[in-house]
Amino acid sequence: MQELKKLPVGFENFQEIRKLDFYYVDKTKLVEQLLENWSKVNLFTRPRRFGKTLNMSMLKSFFEIGTDTALFDGLYISQNEELCKEYMGKYPVIFLSLKGVDGLTFEEARSALCELIAGEVRRFKFLLNSSRLDNDEKNIYRDLISLQGEQETTLATKLKFSLKKISELLYQHYGQKTIVLIDEYDVPLDKAFQHGYYREMVALIRGLFGEALKTNDFLQFAVLTGCLRVSKESIFTGF
């Protein structure tokens, strides 16, 4: 009798689930659907516990340069050999989950966002040794590793341009535009509403997303997931 696979209770990392041979509900058709109908910014809203984070992790594993292609063996998307050849493992990927961006004050929440972005930037430390980046660009990368401890205006500016800057540096290194994945984009806004600093957080997120997703020449496309469809007037104006 064939042994049943374990359920991935508490797991949201696609790579872990596949490598540990947990039971996986194949959602890789999402890759095909995304590439057939993609726009520059793609927003998916679903209820909580609907597998959004796992799907985003799967997208990261599919598109990111250096991916283990064996993770997709036997899954739906592997049948589309032409698509896999063209897109699998071909892009730098920035992946952020904003579900932990919270705080009783705006400053606390902003600090959490700064640390989250800096943590993702640290994944790309190879840029410090890149022959395709000059010293000024490497200094920009060093600044992005730590977004804390700056004066108010300097911090606000660095944070606003952080995702755009790191995508530019990745483009300089790889010669390929970046895919940006932002999971639970609405959590900081929901928490800000609860704690009374919604206007400040809307302004922060609008500025960050505006630079990273709207006026970014180094963006291939972006995927955002959340539970709330925040009004276009507040966040996605002009997208």
What are these regions (language model features)?
Residues M1-F239:
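Phosphate-binding site recognition
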